[in-house]
Amino acid sequence: MNQIEVRNVEKSFKDTKAVRGVSLTIQPGEFVALLGPNGAGKTTLVEMMEGLKKPDKGEILIQGKNWHKHEKELRKIIGLSLQETRFTEKLTIRETLRLFASFFKLGEERVNEVITLTELESKEKSYAGTLSGGQRQRLALAVALLNHPEVLFLDEPTTGLDPHSRLDLWNILKGLKDQGKTTLILTTHYMEEAESLCDHIIILDEGKILREGQLHELLDENSHNLDELFINLTGKKLSEEPQIK
C-alpha cells in the first residue's frame, strides 16, 4: 500500500491558484524532498497532506485513508514540525517534552528516548528561551517524534541555521532514515540537504509538479546536480543562503 497518495489535488486562495492538479505517490520509508521557490505551492500541498487545509478538488490518502473520515486515526501516525515552532520559554527541554508526551499519554521512557535520539542530553535542563536556533529545531524534532510517527513532515527545518547546526540535524535525520520505520516529507531551500537526505525528489513551481523521481533518474548530461536541474526547469536559482540566526 502507498504511504501517501495525492490524486489531482487543487487549492486556491481568492484569485490565486496555489496548487494545480497535483498527483503523486509516496512509498513507506521514503525520504521525500519538496523543492520550489516561494509561492510554488509546496507549503500549501504539505498542509493538505497534514490535514491542516482541505483541498478544493481531488483527494489525499494516507495509508488508504482520507482526512475527512479518519482524522482521529491519522493524527496518531503523523508527526510534524513547522518552520516557526514556538515553545514556552520558562519550561526546560525535558519539561517541554513531558508536556507534549502527556497529550499522547506517553511516559518518561519515551521522553528519554527522544532526548537521546535528538542528542539533547546535555541541554535537557536548559530553558527553551535560552536555546540556539539549532537546539530549538532539535527540540521541535523531538516533539514531532514523540508519538512514533509513521509519517513525519518537516517544513524547512534547517533554514537560518549555521552550517554546524544544519549538519547536526542532518545526521539525526540520517539515523532516523537508517531505521527504516518513518516516511519523511521535507520542504527545503537547500539542494545539498535534498541530495544528502532524500531518495525521492519533487520539484514544484506555480502550483504544478515540473519533475519528480529518484535523484539519479532526474540528473542527466545537462543537469549534473539539483541546482543545475532546478535552473534548467524554472530559470531560477533556489539555493540562496538565508540569513544565519
Model-assigned labels for residue ranges:
Residues 50:
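Helix-to-loop junction immediately C-terminal to a conserved catalytic motif
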Residues 58-69, 73-74:
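Conserved ABC transporter NBD signature motif
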Residues 98, 102, 108-123:
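Conserved ABC ATPase "signature" region
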Residues 127-131:
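Conserved ABC ATPase signature
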Residues 152-156:
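Catalytic Walker B motif of ABC-type/P-loop ATPase nucleotide-binding domains
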